[in-house]
Amino acid sequence: MTASERVVVKELSSSLLDMKFMLKKKKQIETKAAKKKEAKLDQLITEKEAEATCSTEILKSSEPKLEICYDYAKLENLKFGRLSFGGFNKEVELLMEYYEKLQNGMLSDSDDDGMDVDDEEMAKSLGGQKLAALDKKSQSKRERRQQNERNEETTGGRRFNIKDIRKRFAADDVADAPERKFMKPAEDC
């Protein structure tokens, strides 16, 4: 066959290659494709190596665009991360002012003492009710019974809940108001 008589053969379809009698041909085609791909990659690598050895200038694209730094020294002069302007988020603006003063040296770190809550606020929150609950736990049965008896004496022997208190206040309001009676309509003769 001469070059002019050669017929260009298209690749066989995948369904035809999946048939049992065509499996050998399929393996041959796959190995040829893998060899071609490998040859192209080898050629590209040799071209790149030749360019790199021939050129004396440093490629600008090889410079790193990102810099990874594990040292905090470069991050010292950063501003507070959250921003708010024009009173849209007042809490964030207060934090911005605080960190700005801290950075400028107007405030010192020792002013904070690492406490989130002042001593006065802590005393108020842990005050009366919580201490009373702790005292109640440490009381004996006799002491608790005596305290309940005292409470019953002041309330008249009744235990009140919220509904009872509401009814009592509603009854007091009605007692103060003038009594309303049903009035018969006037007879017009």
Swiss-Prot record:
Pfam families per the UniProt record, alphabetical: MPP6
InterPro entries cross-referenced by the UniProt entry: MPP6 (IPR019324)
Top-rank taxon: Eukaryota
UniProt feature, compositional bias: Basic and acidic residues: 133-161
Gene Ontology biological process terms in this record: maturation of 5.8S rRNA
Disordered: annotated segments: 124-161
PANTHER family according to UniProt: M-PHASE PHOSPHOPROTEIN 6
Family: Belongs to the MPP6 family.
Protein's recorded name: Protein F29A7.6
Classification of source organism: Eukaryota, Metazoa, Ecdysozoa, Nematoda, Chromadorea
